[in-house]
């Protein structure tokens, strides 16, 4: 593998090998990350990257599209079957592009949209002031009840009645509970708004049938394909409404994108096929079991879990009682081979660059085959590290760093990732 890269560009070859080592021998707990199969990776690295295919299958602006048409048709049909949708657009380059396409298809610049506040668990593209969504549209953020730390649906309704948004966005990037899509649709209908659900984080759980399918209530659903879905980096838009489908297609192309990434679209097709297997359903069930188990283990060790637990693949740990910042925790854990991300918590007092919490997700470690027993071990190691941070820069006592780093390596060696499947690369 990568023999041609090694010959042509030794510096990039070094990057590839070192990143492979990092993934192989480190514990990946960032909730938005996962490990794609070699089938997905091979497809992404194929000659399909050479083909321009502006337009849609059978309606291209270029010749020579017979086989890329077939790839996109497979991706569309599989996405529709997987999620029970009548229409699917598989061309968005990312989840952000998918969200932008829906906004521009259903609203005009200056219209009002409602989305979950970033500090309460939402996403940048749900109306954050620094994002295009917050610059193009008037944004009314909603949040969680500060006591329960779950969505305050009464407040969502009050805000919707007051501001009459064109689009209400449900979904988030750091919200651990199942969302009441029915309630959101009732609110949307009451004010004449479209309901858009961003299921980027929990799409894999939906595909496996262990999480409510937002398409039952949403006018339109967006997603990424690389988180719990375990596919290539990219976006997806689903709907059952032919008029919305038409508007979305026109907004993606020629509205905000030119040539689609055919190597990625083909890899999406592979990912959707993998997601239809019984093995994938078992995997997603284990992802949730692992998240619940690890959250419980943190609670046993005196940590506060935002909203008291999780229904999904992720949870937020409030580090305030431990007198350590999210920034320091992230750095400390990374020095020991454990990757998490700092995260704001509801009623956050610190800047998002420092934050009071960390977000933890189990998709990647579950892909390795780890189960509840390993979650207990991981929680114990994280607690050991965070209990031995000596300063605000996340410095860990040397003996603890050495011990945990060794244990992380040993655990990863027990659950190999790519090591036994890749030829020609020494790691």
Swiss-Prot record:
Q: Does the keyword 4Fe-4S apply?
A: no
Q: Where in the cell is it found?
A: Cytoplasm
Write down the Pfam families for this protein, in alphabetical order: SHMT
Which Gene Ontology molecular function entries are recorded, alphabetically? Answer: glycine hydroxymethyltransferase activity; pyridoxal phosphate binding
What are its E.C. numbers? Answer: 2.1.2.1
Entry GO CC: cytosol
- Signal peptide feature range: none
InterPro entries, A to Z: PyrdxlP-dep_Trfase, PyrdxlP-dep_Trfase_major, PyrdxlP-dep_Trfase_small, Ser_HO-MeTrfase, Ser_HO-MeTrfase-like, Ser_HO-MeTrfase_PLP_BS, SHMT-like_dom
Reported cofactor(s): pyridoxal 5'-phosphate
Say yes or no: keyword Nucleotide-binding present.
no
- The positions annotated for binding (6S)-5,6,7,8-tetrahydrofolate are 118, 122-124, 351-353
* Site residues by UniProt (Plays an important role in substrate specificity): 226
- Cited NCBIfam families: PRK00011.1 (NF000586)
What the record says about family reads:
Belongs to the SHMT family.
Summarizing the function annotation, the protein's role is: Catalyzes the reversible interconversion of serine and glycine with tetrahydrofolate (THF) serving as the one-carbon carrier. This reaction serves as the major source of one-carbon groups required for the biosynthesis of purines, thymidylate, methionine, and other important biomolecules. Also exhibits THF-independent aldolase activity toward beta-hydroxyamino acids, producing glycine and aldehydes, via a retro-aldol mechanism.
Subunit field text: Homodimer.
Name this polypeptide is given:
Serine hydroxymethyltransferase
Give the organism the record lists. Answer: Thermotoga sp. (strain RQ2)
- This chain is encoded by the gene named glyA
